[in-house]
A protein has these predicted regions:
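Glycoside hydrolase catalytic-domain context in secreted enzymes
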Residues: 1-331
């Protein structure tokens, strides 16, 4: 992480490691309280942050939604002041997660610099009232203002001189290479793979048309170009006998789609079945309740095997999945 931060900031912009700290679950992440002793906190949960702060001096850190020992991380003086700034020497700005400010004035007092999203005049009025009431001091506000202005000045030149043009084709080629080199072959019964040129293939599975290549939520990006299996078929040298979605992406049973896929499979030498986890399974704000591929996909696999045993499963998932169904495919 330290090397990554150095690489980002070498371009004159700010890196923002997150989420500080003990953000160990997504379910109820805005209300959960991570309760732990000091040794566990420092030796297990904070070690990664300590390394990145001391070795690469990130200009910002993002606080987490959760409470730590009863206090919201974004208002936690022990985390933001005692450990981050005093013990580690962090001099940058602390940024809230999106909507992660519970008490803005208390956050400012205890080390939170920037509230996101921008709350407009509400934050100003809240801070003015807090200063007048004695809840916080002008010195608290000044300290956060110094951090914010330093961030603005340090990144101003890079922002002003930033070119929005880049070599999209080169970036795409690198992404394709990364995808190819990270593919893992788990099984290849009867040496079914690689498929010989001209092999008649039935392409089945919603993911063949709309691939899963990233998570959902705030991590999702709008790509300039995305390669789908169907879109790249001309490069394969294989004969496609047809495509069928085969299953509902969100896991609902669909007998008609399954029947269409089974009929198509009977026309092919090999079935290429694209399975995986959908966007709902892999999004922020929740934790998976199991490690299973949706049951409608497994039911489809079993139905296809009855009419064509030569099945290659292409499994797309951003996390581990159980594969008790692997005996129903050859590769």
């Amino acid at each position: 992480a330290a090397g990554y931060v150095r690489g980002i900031q070498s371009n004159g912009i700010a890196a923002c490691p997150k989420h500080f700290a003990v953000n160990s679950q997504e379910l109820r992440r805005m209300a959960s309280d991570s309760v732990l002793d000091e040794r566990t906190l420092r030796e297990i949960y904070l070690t990664g942050f300590e390394i990145v702060v001391k070795e690469s001096a990130p200009k910002t850190i993002m606080s987490s939604y959760n409470l730590v020992n009863g206090t919201y991380a974004n208002e936690n003086a022990h985390l933001l002041q005692d450990i981050l700034r005093r013990d580690w020497g962090f001099t940058g700005a602390v940024v809230t997660d999106w909507g992660g400010s519970n008490d803005h004035a208390l956050g400012v007092k205890n080390g939170s610099t920037l509230e996101m999203p921008a709350p407009g005049g509400d934050a100003v009025r809240e801070l003015l009232a807090a200063v007048k009431s004695g809840k916080i001091t002008e010195a608290d506000v000044d300290a956060r203002l110094d951090e914010l202005l330093t961030l603005i000045y340090d990144t101003h030149a890079a922002v002003q001189n930033h070119s929005r043009s880049f070599d999209a084709d080169a970036h795409h080629a690198l992404a394709r290479r990364a995808a190819a080199e990270s593919t893992v072959l788990l099984k290849n019964e009867d040496n079914l793979l690689p498929l010989a040129p001209g092999t008649k293939v039935a392409v089945i599975g919603d993911f063949a048309e709309t691939p899963r290549y990233q998570g959902a939520g705030s991590s999702a990006v709008n790509s300039i170009k995305v390669d789908s299996l169907l879109g790249c078929w001309a490069e394969s040298g294989l004969e496609q006998v047809g495509f069928a979605a085969g299953f509902d992406r969100q896991g609902k049973p669909d007998a008609a789609k399954q029947a269409e896929a089974v009929a198509l499979a009977q026309k092919a030498d090999v079935v290429l079945l694209c399975m995986g986890l959908d966007e709902i399974k892999e999004s922020e704000g929740l934790d998976r309740s199991d490690m299973c591929v949706a049951s409608n996909q497994i039911e489809l696999l079993r139905a296809l095997q009855k009419v064509n045993p030569n099945i290659v499963v292409v499994l797309s998932a951003g996390a581990s999945v159980e594969t008790p169904w692997a005996n129903h495919c050859k590769a």
